[in-house]
């Protein structure tokens, strides 16, 4: 290297090795844990570049300087010869209600197989009948041909309640009182028998309300509502001898579904005329031509599936038969249809969960399945298969967890579909009318 080159390549003095003295026998060793190599790399490679579009006003420079102070404190040196500053005290976010996210509820396990299968020989495959009911005393009643059987879910024992004479039968409908002690039995000859299931004795026969078979029954305390093939709906006060107190006229074909609301203020009926009616007892005895509160004609097939919502008193779910296959939701205050969901098959029965916002539907051809829906999104949570024929009947246990389903394949299946019961489960209703039939002197 010539002398000219040496003149232009002077070595900075602070890079030359320092002479050691007797008083300074060691070097300063930087604390590597306090180094900021990322910032150093940026400063060496990008720090000197300038953006040609950068605003160079005084306020902009002041802002950038202040931002650098806030974001990059004590970064004037690349090598740090001191320890890191102490970390900030940890903040307990549990003291602030706005910081705590709600705990995520674990996804509930839904068994895909039935817990138990019972034979039900002679079960009639008729869409217009109602042959299964689970009482509040935890006894399941099922009608097989001319005979009504009782299955005690607590003990597992089965007993025969009654076999109807051939000239009166077969049995076309059954329904428990709210206390689970008495059972109404509708017959093909238009009569309704009332049975005390504690003593296994018949206490009364209701006649004169219908001209043909009684396929639907629904209790509201001492009022037994009956629906017949003649299209009539009759309210019977079982405490008095002349039991018929109101008659509703509106259906032109057989009444195949009846349900009282939880409050007992409204009653829903569905028929083979594809019509759903909402009835109010105050209108039944009026002289007006129209007795119903609302009339829904949107279904295109028979409506048997009816279910009042347990958490919203005015909400009613209905399901259409073959050719319709829709579940519809109604506001029974206004008469508005809130939603309509296509299921793809005949809707035979509907049940609400007592503890969750869920709805269970049973179906016919092609899959003959039970479908669990999340309300109000109506997204499918599970499909339960096992039946080989349309699932006409469903009944819910008193604690709300177990569902019994009966189909034309003559099988009765038990499903743990609704999970564990709520912490405050409802106790079996006490009998409001312990002397319900005390004023009746004759059984027939």
Swiss-Prot record:
Pull one GO CC term from this UniProt entry.
cytoplasm
Where is this chain's protein located in or outside the cell? Answer: Cytoplasm
Question: SUPFAM superfamilies of this UniProt entry?
Answer: WD40 repeat-like
| Region Disordered: start-end pairs | 88-108
Q: In which pathway does it act?
A: Protein modification; protein ubiquitination
Record flagged with keyword Lipid metabolism? no
Q: Name one GO molecular function term.
A: anaphase-promoting complex binding
PANTHER family for this protein: CELL DIVISION CYCLE 20 CDC20 FIZZY -RELATED (PTHR19918), FI02843P (PTHR19918:SF8)
Protein role: Component of the anaphase promoting complex/cyclosome (APC/C), a cell cycle-regulated E3 ubiquitin-protein ligase complex that controls progression through mitosis and the G1 phase of the cell cycle.
Q: What is this protein called?
A: Cell division cycle 20.4, cofactor of APC complex
Origin organism lineage? Eukaryota, Viridiplantae, Streptophyta, Embryophyta, Tracheophyta
Q: Which gene encodes it?
A: CDC20-4
């Amino acid at each position: 290297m010539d002398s000219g080159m040496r003149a232009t390549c002077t070595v900075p003095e602070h890079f030359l090795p320092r002479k050691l003295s007797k008083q300074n026998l060691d070097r300063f060793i930087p604390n590597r844990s306090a180094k900021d190599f990322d910032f150093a790399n940026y400063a060496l490679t990008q720090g000197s570049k300038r953006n040609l579009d950068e605003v160079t006003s005084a306020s902009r420079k002041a802002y950038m300087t202040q931002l650098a102070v806030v974001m990059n404190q004590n970064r004037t040196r690349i090598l740090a010869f001191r320890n890191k500053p102490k970390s900030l005290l940890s903040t307990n976010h549990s003291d602030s209600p706005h910081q705590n996210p709600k705990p995520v509820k674990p996804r509930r396990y839904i068994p895909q197989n039935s817990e138990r299968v019972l034979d039900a020989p002679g079960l009639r495959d008729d869409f217009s009948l109602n042959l299964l009911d689970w009482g509040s005393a935890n006894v399941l009643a099922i009608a097989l041909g001319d005979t009504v059987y009782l299955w005690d879910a607590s003990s597992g024992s089965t007993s025969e309640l009654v076999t109807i004479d051939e000239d009166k039968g077969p049995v076309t409908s059954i329904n428990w009182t709210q206390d689970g002690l008495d059972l109404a039995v509708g017959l093909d000859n238009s009569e309704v028998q009332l049975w005390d299931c504690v003593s296994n004795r018949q206490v009364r026969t209701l006649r004169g309300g219908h001209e043909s078979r009684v396929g639907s029954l629904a209790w509201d305390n001492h009022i037994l509502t009956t629906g017949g093939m003649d299209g009539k709906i009759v309210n019977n006060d079982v405490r008095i001898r002349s039991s018929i107190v109101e008659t509703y006229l509106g259906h032109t074909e057989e009444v195949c579904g009846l349900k009282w609301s939880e409050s007992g203020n409204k009653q829903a009926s569905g028929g083979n005329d594809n019509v759903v009616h909402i009835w109010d007892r105050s209108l039944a005895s009026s002289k007006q031509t129209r007795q119903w509160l609302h009339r829904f004609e949107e279904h295109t097939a028979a409506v048997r599936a009816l279910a009042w919502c347990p958490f919203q008193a005015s909400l009613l779910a209905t399901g259409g038969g073959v050719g319709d296959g829709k579940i519809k939701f109604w506001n029974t205050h206004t008469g508005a249809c809130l939603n309509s969901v296509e299921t793809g098959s005949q809707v035979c029965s509907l049940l609400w969960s007592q503890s969750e916002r869920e709805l269970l539907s049973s179906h016919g051809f092609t899959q003959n399945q039970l479908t669990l829906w999340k309300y109000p999104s109506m997204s499918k949570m599970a499909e339960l298969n096992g039946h080989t024929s349309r699932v006409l009947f469903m009944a819910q246990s008193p604690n709300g967890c177990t569902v019994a389903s009966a189909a034309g394949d003559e099988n009765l299946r038990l499903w743990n579909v609704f999970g564990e019961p709520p912490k405050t489960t409802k106790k079996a209703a006490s009998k409001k009318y312990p002397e319900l039939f005390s004023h009746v002197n004759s059984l027939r």
